[in-house]
A protein has these predicted regions:
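N-terminal targeting sequences that direct proteins away from the cytosol to non-cytosolic compartments
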Residues: 1-167, 171-215
Length: 215
Protein backbone atom coordinates (compact mmCIF):
# COMPACT_ATOMS: atom_id res chain seq x y z
CA UNK A 1 0.00 0.00 0.00
CA UNK A 2 3.05 2.26 -0.35
CA UNK A 3 1.52 4.42 -3.07
CA UNK A 4 2.05 8.08 -2.23
CA UNK A 5 0.44 10.80 -4.30
CA UNK A 6 0.83 14.55 -4.54
CA UNK A 7 -0.34 16.31 -1.39
CA UNK A 8 -3.36 18.60 -1.23
CA UNK A 9 -3.27 21.33 1.42
CA UNK A 10 -6.63 21.76 3.13
CA UNK A 11 -7.30 24.91 5.16
CA UNK A 12 -9.95 25.37 7.83
CA UNK A 13 -10.55 28.07 10.39
CA UNK A 14 -7.38 28.18 12.45
CA UNK A 15 -5.36 25.36 10.89
CA UNK A 16 -4.21 23.64 7.71
CA UNK A 17 -3.25 20.05 6.96
CA UNK A 18 -2.02 18.16 3.89
CA UNK A 19 -3.62 14.94 2.68
CA UNK A 20 -2.81 12.88 -0.44
CA UNK A 21 -4.47 14.40 -3.50
CA UNK A 22 -6.46 11.21 -4.11
CA UNK A 23 -8.22 11.52 -0.74
CA UNK A 24 -11.81 12.73 -0.42
CA UNK A 25 -12.35 16.02 1.43
CA UNK A 26 -15.80 17.52 1.91
CA UNK A 27 -18.18 19.51 4.08
CA UNK A 28 -19.45 17.34 6.98
CA UNK A 29 -22.55 19.47 7.72
CA UNK A 30 -25.75 17.37 7.39
CA UNK A 31 -27.49 19.85 5.10
CA UNK A 32 -24.78 19.72 2.44
CA UNK A 33 -22.69 16.57 2.83
CA UNK A 34 -24.83 14.15 0.76
CA UNK A 35 -24.85 16.42 -2.28
CA UNK A 36 -21.14 17.05 -1.84
CA UNK A 37 -20.36 13.33 -1.61
CA UNK A 38 -22.44 12.36 -4.65
CA UNK A 39 -20.88 15.16 -6.70
CA UNK A 40 -17.35 14.11 -5.77
CA UNK A 41 -18.02 10.43 -6.45
CA UNK A 42 -19.47 11.26 -9.88
CA UNK A 43 -16.44 13.41 -10.72
CA UNK A 44 -14.01 10.71 -9.57
CA UNK A 45 -15.75 7.99 -11.58
CA UNK A 46 -15.80 10.15 -14.72
CA UNK A 47 -12.03 10.50 -14.39
CA UNK A 48 -11.52 6.83 -13.45
CA UNK A 49 -14.29 4.68 -15.00
CA UNK A 50 -12.58 1.51 -13.76
CA UNK A 51 -13.72 2.42 -10.24
CA UNK A 52 -17.42 2.33 -11.18
CA UNK A 53 -18.04 -1.15 -9.64
CA UNK A 54 -17.14 0.35 -6.24
CA UNK A 55 -19.53 3.30 -6.45
CA UNK A 56 -21.90 2.10 -3.72
CA UNK A 57 -18.97 1.25 -1.43
CA UNK A 58 -17.52 4.73 -1.86
CA UNK A 59 -20.83 6.49 -1.19
CA UNK A 60 -21.67 4.34 1.83
CA UNK A 61 -18.22 4.74 3.41
CA UNK A 62 -18.02 8.49 2.81
CA UNK A 63 -21.53 9.13 4.15
CA UNK A 64 -20.79 7.17 7.32
CA UNK A 65 -17.41 8.87 7.81
CA UNK A 66 -19.00 12.31 7.39
CA UNK A 67 -21.85 11.50 9.79
CA UNK A 68 -19.46 10.13 12.43
CA UNK A 69 -17.20 13.17 12.06
CA UNK A 70 -20.16 15.53 12.54
CA UNK A 71 -21.41 13.64 15.60
CA UNK A 72 -17.96 13.74 17.18
CA UNK A 73 -17.66 17.50 16.64
CA UNK A 74 -14.88 17.34 14.05
CA UNK A 75 -13.95 20.51 12.18
CA UNK A 76 -12.41 18.56 9.30
CA UNK A 77 -12.72 15.08 7.80
CA UNK A 78 -10.55 13.63 5.04
CA UNK A 79 -11.12 10.10 3.74
CA UNK A 80 -9.10 7.52 1.85
CA UNK A 81 -10.97 5.02 -0.32
CA UNK A 82 -8.42 3.46 -2.65
CA UNK A 83 -8.65 0.43 -4.92
CA UNK A 84 -5.34 -1.42 -5.08
CA UNK A 85 -6.56 -4.22 -7.32
CA UNK A 86 -8.58 -6.00 -4.63
CA UNK A 87 -12.29 -6.68 -4.53
CA UNK A 88 -12.98 -3.92 -2.00
CA UNK A 89 -11.38 -0.45 -1.65
CA UNK A 90 -9.02 0.14 1.28
CA UNK A 91 -10.55 2.81 3.52
CA UNK A 92 -9.39 5.14 6.28
CA UNK A 93 -10.00 8.67 7.54
CA UNK A 94 -8.39 11.59 9.35
CA UNK A 95 -10.35 14.12 11.41
CA UNK A 96 -9.37 17.30 13.23
CA UNK A 97 -11.31 18.44 16.31
CA UNK A 98 -10.84 21.20 18.87
CA UNK A 99 -11.21 19.69 22.34
CA UNK A 100 -10.64 20.75 25.92
CA UNK A 101 -11.56 19.92 29.46
CA UNK A 102 -11.54 21.11 33.05
CA UNK A 103 -10.61 19.66 36.40
CA UNK A 104 -13.15 18.98 39.15
CA UNK A 105 -12.29 22.46 40.48
CA UNK A 106 -13.11 24.07 37.14
CA UNK A 107 -9.54 24.79 36.11
CA UNK A 108 -8.48 24.12 32.49
CA UNK A 109 -6.74 20.79 32.05
CA UNK A 110 -3.03 21.11 31.23
CA UNK A 111 -2.12 20.66 27.57
CA UNK A 112 1.62 20.17 28.02
CA UNK A 113 2.49 16.91 26.21
CA UNK A 114 4.05 15.33 29.29
CA UNK A 115 0.96 16.16 31.36
CA UNK A 116 -1.34 14.79 28.66
CA UNK A 117 0.57 11.52 28.32
CA UNK A 118 0.38 11.07 32.10
CA UNK A 119 -3.43 11.02 31.76
CA UNK A 120 -3.48 8.51 28.87
CA UNK A 121 -3.50 4.81 29.68
CA UNK A 122 -1.28 2.26 27.97
CA UNK A 123 -3.09 -1.00 27.16
CA UNK A 124 -1.24 -4.26 26.59
CA UNK A 125 -2.71 -7.08 24.50
CA UNK A 126 -3.02 -10.15 26.75
CA UNK A 127 -3.40 -12.51 23.81
CA UNK A 128 -3.21 -12.41 20.03
CA UNK A 129 -6.10 -10.44 18.58
CA UNK A 130 -6.66 -8.30 21.68
CA UNK A 131 -6.88 -4.52 21.46
CA UNK A 132 -3.84 -2.50 22.54
CA UNK A 133 -2.65 1.09 22.89
CA UNK A 134 0.75 2.76 23.17
CA UNK A 135 1.36 6.29 24.49
CA UNK A 136 4.23 8.50 23.38
CA UNK A 137 5.20 12.04 22.40
CA UNK A 138 6.14 13.29 18.94
CA UNK A 139 7.58 16.49 17.54
CA UNK A 140 5.57 18.11 14.75
CA UNK A 141 7.80 20.32 12.56
CA UNK A 142 6.91 23.97 12.94
CA UNK A 143 4.48 23.23 15.77
CA UNK A 144 6.39 21.47 18.54
CA UNK A 145 5.90 18.47 20.84
CA UNK A 146 2.54 16.73 21.15
CA UNK A 147 1.16 13.72 23.01
CA UNK A 148 0.10 10.71 20.94
CA UNK A 149 -1.65 7.36 21.30
CA UNK A 150 -1.72 4.63 18.68
CA UNK A 151 -2.90 1.05 18.54
CA UNK A 152 -5.75 -1.30 17.73
CA UNK A 153 -8.69 -0.05 19.79
CA UNK A 154 -12.39 -0.62 20.34
CA UNK A 155 -13.78 2.76 19.32
CA UNK A 156 -17.25 3.85 20.49
CA UNK A 157 -19.74 4.36 17.65
CA UNK A 158 -20.66 8.10 17.75
CA UNK A 159 -24.23 8.65 18.91
CA UNK A 160 -24.95 4.94 19.45
CA UNK A 161 -27.38 4.56 22.35
CA UNK A 162 -26.41 0.92 22.87
CA UNK A 163 -22.78 1.82 23.50
CA UNK A 164 -21.47 -0.38 20.71
CA UNK A 165 -17.86 -0.23 19.54
CA UNK A 166 -15.91 -0.88 16.35
CA UNK A 167 -12.37 -2.28 16.40
CA UNK A 168 -10.05 -0.03 14.41
CA UNK A 169 -6.52 1.08 13.77
CA UNK A 170 -6.39 4.37 15.67
CA UNK A 171 -3.81 7.14 16.06
CA UNK A 172 -4.62 10.28 18.07
CA UNK A 173 -2.29 13.27 18.39
CA UNK A 174 -3.04 16.02 20.92
CA UNK A 175 -1.58 19.33 19.69
CA UNK A 176 -1.67 22.23 22.21
CA UNK A 177 -3.45 25.28 20.77
CA UNK A 178 -1.34 28.45 21.21
CA UNK A 179 -3.04 31.12 23.28
CA UNK A 180 -6.02 28.95 24.26
CA UNK A 181 -5.62 27.55 27.74
CA UNK A 182 -6.86 24.00 28.10
CA UNK A 183 -7.46 23.48 24.36
CA UNK A 184 -5.85 20.95 22.02
CA UNK A 185 -6.30 20.18 18.34
CA UNK A 186 -7.00 16.45 18.20
CA UNK A 187 -5.78 14.92 14.93
CA UNK A 188 -7.23 11.41 14.72
CA UNK A 189 -6.59 8.80 12.04
CA UNK A 190 -8.58 5.57 11.89
CA UNK A 191 -9.21 2.56 9.67
CA UNK A 192 -11.03 -0.73 10.12
CA UNK A 193 -8.49 -2.54 7.92
CA UNK A 194 -6.61 -4.11 10.83
CA UNK A 195 -4.25 -6.18 8.66
CA UNK A 196 -2.68 -2.95 7.35
CA UNK A 197 -2.20 -1.35 10.76
CA UNK A 198 1.51 -0.58 10.35
CA UNK A 199 0.96 1.00 6.93
CA UNK A 200 -1.85 3.15 8.29
CA UNK A 201 0.28 4.25 11.25
CA UNK A 202 2.87 5.49 8.72
CA UNK A 203 0.20 7.30 6.67
CA UNK A 204 -1.45 8.92 9.70
CA UNK A 205 1.93 10.00 11.07
CA UNK A 206 2.90 11.54 7.72
CA UNK A 207 -0.39 13.47 7.47
CA UNK A 208 -0.26 14.64 11.09
CA UNK A 209 3.29 15.91 10.56
CA UNK A 210 1.88 18.45 8.05
CA UNK A 211 -0.55 19.97 10.59
CA UNK A 212 0.01 23.69 11.12
CA UNK A 213 -1.90 26.43 12.89
CA UNK A 214 -2.94 29.23 10.53
CA UNK A 215 -1.03 32.49 10.81
Amino acid sequence: MARYMEALTVERGGFRIKVPESWWEFDVRPESRDDSIHRMVNERLRAHPELAPHRDTYVSFLRKAAADAWKSGALYCGCMAESFGGATPITGSVTVSLVGGRTSKGDPLPTDPEAVTAQLAVKEARREGDSWRKVTTVDIPGVGPAARTYGIEDVPVPGDELGRTIRAVLMQTFVPVPGQEGKVALVAGSSQVLDLAESFFDIFDAITSTFRFAD
